[in-house]
Amino acid sequence: MYDINKVREDFPILSRTVYGKPLVYFDNGATTQKPLCVLDAMREEYLNVNANVHRGVHWMSQQATDLHEAARETVRKFINARSTTEIVFTRGTTE
């Protein structure tokens, strides 16, 4: 069983209160809140490897592509997919 308070600690925005109550966010179809590890990874990418994926021949583009494909492999393992070709990244749940 998950300790919901430990899970909430991973999401900085959920430390806020609204009208004196802990913030609860249910509009996940529009966007999802990100845990700190995701925010840290995004910050690192924007600071050090921000380039087009699969569209450039320069060093930074290759680095970005390698990281993108490594993320695809991580997701594949997490959901036990047979192949990375089964993993499709989109901008949102309704795309």
Please name every model-derived segment.
Residues M1-E95:
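Pyridoxal 5′-phosphate
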